[in-house]
């Protein structure tokens, strides 16, 4: 049996694509704005 090579890290995910990370940059804020306008239930992952 081979071991899993891809293990997701919650901390890394939050730091790169979390809500607060998105709000730091102008393009990230644009992403949130676009997702809000589309009526997304989840604005960000994690």
From Swiss-Prot:
Belongs to the bacterial ribosomal protein bL34 family. GO terms for molecular function: structural constituent of ribosome. The gene is rpmH. Coiled coil: none annotated. GO terms for biological process: translation. NCBIfam families: rpmH_bact (TIGR01030). GO terms for cellular component: ribonucleoprotein complex; ribosome. It comes from Pseudanabaena sp. (strain PCC 6903). This is Large ribosomal subunit protein bL34.
């Amino acid at each position: 049996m081979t071991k899993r090579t891809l293990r997701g890290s919650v901390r890394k995910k939050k730091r790169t694509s979390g809500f607060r990370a998105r709000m730091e940059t102008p393009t990230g804020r644009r992403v949130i704005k676009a997702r809000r306008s589309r009526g997304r239930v989840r604005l960000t992952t994690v």
